[in-house]
Every structure is written in C-alpha cells, then in structure tokens.
Amino acid sequence: MKISVEQLKQLNKEEYILIDIRDAEEAFKNPIENSIVLSGESVLSKEFDSTKKIIIVCAQGHVSDFVAQKLQEKGYDAYSVD
C-alpha cells in the first residue's frame, strides 16, 4: 500500500513508526524527522509494535514498496511513501 507525504503529515506521530531505508549516507545527510534509519534487510528481520502503522521511506520508492509488501505478508499494517 502507498501513503502520500500529505497523508503521512495528517497522522498522529503516535500512530506510526517511520523507517528510513535509504543508504546510511543519504539518511544522515538529509535526515527525516522522527524516522528510524535501518537497512531494508534488517527491517524484515525485526519485530514491531503491531498496533502501529509501519511507514517505509526509500530514495525512489521501489525498495520501500517491496519491504512494505513483505511486512504486510507478516501481518503488519505497512505502507510505502509515494
């Protein structure tokens, strides 16, 4: 599933976990407020609070789509930022 930046801004920060899977250099040069920086692989191996939406951000959207889909298959309410 996709979520727009505008939709994300409307959510209460307590409702979601924002995960930045861009490469570490890009993530630290241009940090996204309230995000956790992780690799796509490590996201798939972690456990998250299942009561929250999981929002995935990457540089172009392709990898975040894949990671969000895999998290959905594991039962999470996961989204890729469009």
Residue ranges and their predicted role:
Residues 1-30, 76:
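Flexible, polar/low-complexity N-terminal or interdomain linker segments that lie immediately upstream
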Residues 3-5, 39-40, 82:
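Short loop/edge segments at beta-strand edges and connector loops
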Residues 9-11, 41-50:
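Short amphipathic alpha-helix with an adjacent loop that forms part of the alpha/beta core around
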Residues 25, 44, 62-64:
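Glycine-rich nucleotide phosphate-binding loop and flanking beta-alpha elements
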Residues 27-33, 45-49:
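Short loop/helix-cap segments at secondary-structure boundaries that form the rim of catalytic
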Residues 32-38, 51-54:
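Active-site regions of enzymes building and remodeling cell-envelope glycoconjugates
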Residues 48-82:
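Catalytic cysteine-centered active loop of the rhodanese-like fold, especially the PTP/DSP P-loop
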